[in-house]
Amino acid sequence: MSEAEKQAVSFACQRCLQPIVLDEQLEKISVHAMAELSLPIYGDNGNTLDPQDASSFDHFVPPYRLTDSINGTGFMLVSDGRDNKKMSAAFKLKAELFDCLSSNSEIDHPLCEECADSMLEIMDRELRIAEDEWDVYKAYLDELEQQRVAPNVEALDKELDELKRSEQQLLSELKELKKEEQSLNDAIAEEEQEREELHEQEESYWREYTKHRRELMLTEDDKRSLECQIAYSKQQLDKLRDTNIFNITFHIWHAGHFGTINNFRLGRLPSVSVDWSEINAAWGQTVLLLSALARKIGLTFERYRVVPFGNHSYVEVLGENRELPLYGSGGFKFFWDTKFDAAMVAFLDCLTQFQKEVEKRDTEFLLPYKMEKGKIIDPSTGNSYSIKIQFNSEEQWTKALKFMLTNLKWGLAWVSSQFVSP
């Protein structure tokens, strides 16, 4: 490609960015033609910059000029890329020409033939729209000119006087209205103040209401809680009224050949060796039961006083200051000691005294087993069983103790029936 062809394709269309070939006549443009092209297309309309818009002038961006670019940025250069410092005079002339055209119109130059035709069509369309608008304005102006008539001065003066009188009347009415407005404003202020006071009273009322409502809710909660507690207490009271304290505290039953009190076996068998600590505990519970029953009916034993002392309970002989132990430890020496037997006989005597006291109060009361002189008699067989352990078999002794506990259970049942509230 020749040098001339390279320079002929040095610009691009500013719309489609396609490379364009310039007409050769642009090479021969004169200085006078350049000067004329530099003149603005539109004359100065005499408008000055509005002070309010002065701040926006700082953000004004002038149109891009080809000559302001060092390397021709903004145009597509398809030449051999030589340094811009060596740009030919013809290229600079063309660049200045396009800058002049761009600064005097809203369209950036150069344009290719197709884009120029497209822009001409757009401008023709805008021109036709402007001409149509001008025709409309011209017709309206002609109509206004035809309607213009000579003014009637007298009628206008009369109308002016009427307007002045109307103005005075309106001013007077306005003054009255202002007074009325002031009066209404004062009334509104008073009403507003009263409203504020009522609002404060309402707020105070609601605070008091909320406070009392909360206290009421707490009181109702306390009331419901107390009602629940009372109901529970009544339930427990009814349950306690129906409950026999003696039956709960002293459970007399049997386990095979043994009589038991609170699950402690009273007695021994050759085949069942009951530990003496269990026998002593059973005697302690038995003494405690008889003592409680006697105290309940107000009975004081003659000759003896039963003393509950756990597994070391005893019977005190009144007048002799002597204690008869109701506990033992076994062994050869124990079986030859008569104090344990004497204590059991004394206890049986106290139980007999309790029986007689109950029979005085209730003639129909009768124990299932008769007791006399340290023995218990089975009415079904007529056999008597000694409560002593000396010179007695363990079977006989255990059966006597079982019968004794049975009699004691009957006495417990009678006392419970007499002293339990209906």
From Swiss-Prot:
Residues 182-201 are annotated as: Disordered. It holds the Pfam family APG6_N. One of its GO terms (cellular component) is phosphatidylinositol 3-kinase complex, class III, type II. Keywords: Coiled coil. GO terms for molecular function: phosphatidylinositol 3-kinase binding; protein-macromolecule adaptor activity; small GTPase binding. Residues 119-243 form a coiled coil. One of its GO terms (biological process) is response to oxidative stress. It comes from the Eukaryota. Interacts with Rab18, preferentially binding to the GTP-bound form. Belongs to the beclin family. Plays a central role in autophagy. This is Beclin-1-like protein. It comes from Drosophila melanogaster (Fruit fly).
